[in-house]
Curated annotation (Swiss-Prot):
FMN binds at residues 124-126, 286, 301-305, 327. NADP(+) binds at residue 47. Its cofactor is FMNH2. Belongs to the chorismate synthase family. It comes from Prochlorococcus marinus (strain NATL1A). One of its GO terms (molecular function) is chorismate synthase activity. Disulfide bonds: none annotated. The lineage of its organism: Bacteria, Bacillati, Cyanobacteriota, Cyanophyceae, Synechococcales. This is Chorismate synthase. One of its GO terms (biological process) is chorismate biosynthetic process. This reaction introduces a second double bond into the aromatic ring system.
Length: 361
């Protein structure tokens, strides 16, 4: 019941971290959309484990198989099914902790809710579930490029207490991908990498903030009042594993400003487009996109599973000391960048189809 998302462009993800595979079914994608399969694989490669010294060493190729919905590389308008097989899962790594509630992990709440859980690898609570989201998000990005020439870029803004000065309007994809932490500010990236490595050696972890910009978004996306654009973006992004906060535009910083400081003055224009002198609104006003860049940020907590000893309990409520084994990211942010892009793309693609259906010219 909680594994589907969207109204017109819908996705349903399936699979567990240590099961046979994970994947997604997309429904509502328009027909005759020409897809670049390499782009889907490239996005999955950016998400996959084992890609650098600061990510989990789990070695998965994450090669996507497209089972339905395409003729050649064109969409048929029918459900698109994609799957990635799990090849390097190690259930034995979890044999000693399968009845242990890891602090701040989903073990305890899944067990209390369902009375059963896939303890090996975290099951559906694992970040491996996001493979389906990233694959579907890649399709959504290609749809947005074709119909609106929209570009979506995300990057690591902060790790622990190291924050990079970045201008969202100037960031390029190549700048983001030039280092393993996916921060376009190289001097800050070097410090971030050192910090993640240091915490990893201690058996600890750290969190941070990912920032995202949407360039050339269509005007009019968002369905007030309950499906405002920022509301759906918040829901989508807060559904990602390890997320703890969301803000758009000036965010919480805007609460320190006066109205005269925060308001975005409209500029005269000969076109039918809206232009503002500033963008504290982050491209969204009244829950509807105004055509300016959409700028948002997502906070991720430190990885819950760490090698340091922690006090916890088992399923029977007995006090125990946990020292987790297995393979885990000391920081999820570098691999979460394509996840953020994917969820933003899925929301925008869904709202684009809804806008075209309700408010056609």
């Amino acid at each position: 019941m909680g594994s589907s998302f969207g109204k017109l462009f819908t996705i349903s993800t399936f699979g567990e971290s240590h099961g046979g595979g994970v994947g997604v079914i997309i429904d509502g994608c328009p027909p005759r959309l020409e897809l670049d399969i390499n782009e889907i694989q490239n996005d999955l490669n950016r998400r996959r484990p084992g890609q650098s010294k600061i990510t989990t060493p789990r070695n998965e190729s994450d090669e996507v198989e497209i089972l339905s919905g395409l003729l050649g590389n064109k969409t048929l308008g029918t459900p698109i099914a994609m799957v990635v097989r799990n090849k390097d899962h190690r259930p034995k790594d979890y044999s000693e902790i399968k009845k242990t509630f890891r602090p701040s992990h989903a073990d305890a709440t899944y067990q209390k809710k369902y009375g059963i859980q896939a303890s090996s690898g975290g099951g559906r609570a694992s970040a491996r579930e996001t493979i389906g989201r990233v694959a579907a998000g890649s399709v959504a990005k290609q749809l947005l490029t074709k119909f609106a020439k929209t570009e979506i870029l995300a990057w690591v803004k902060r790790i622990h207490d190291i924050e990079a000065e970045i201008h969202p309007s100037e960031v390029t994809f190549d700048e983001i991908e030039k280092n393993i932490v996916r921060c376009p500010n190289q001097s800050a990236a070097d410090l971030m990498i050192q910090r993640v490595e240091a915490f990893g050696k201690e058996g600890d972890s750290c969190g941070g903030v990912i920032e995202c910009v949407v360039r050339n978004p269509p005007i009019g996306l968002g369905m007030p009042v309950f499906d405002k654009l920022e509301a759906d973006l918040a829901k989508a992004l807060m559904s990602l594993p390890a997320t703890k906060g969301f803000e758009v535009g000036s965010g919480f910083g805007g609460t320190y400003l006066k109205g005269s400081e925060h308001n975005d003055p409209f500029l005269p224009s000969d076109s039918n487009q809206l232009k503002t002198a500033t963008n504290n609104s982050g491209g969204i006003q009244g829950g509807i996109s105004n055509g300016e860049d959409i700028v948002l940020r997502v906070g991720f907590k430190p990885t819950a599973t760490i090698r340091k000893s922690q006090k916890t309990i088992d399923e029977d409520g007995n006090a125990i000391t946990l020292k987790a084994t297995g393979r885990h990211d000391p920081c999820v942010l570098p691999r979460a960048v394509p996840m953020v892009e994917a969820m933003v793309a899925l929301v925008l693609a869904d709202h684009l189809l809804r806008q075209r259906g309700q408010c056609t010219d």
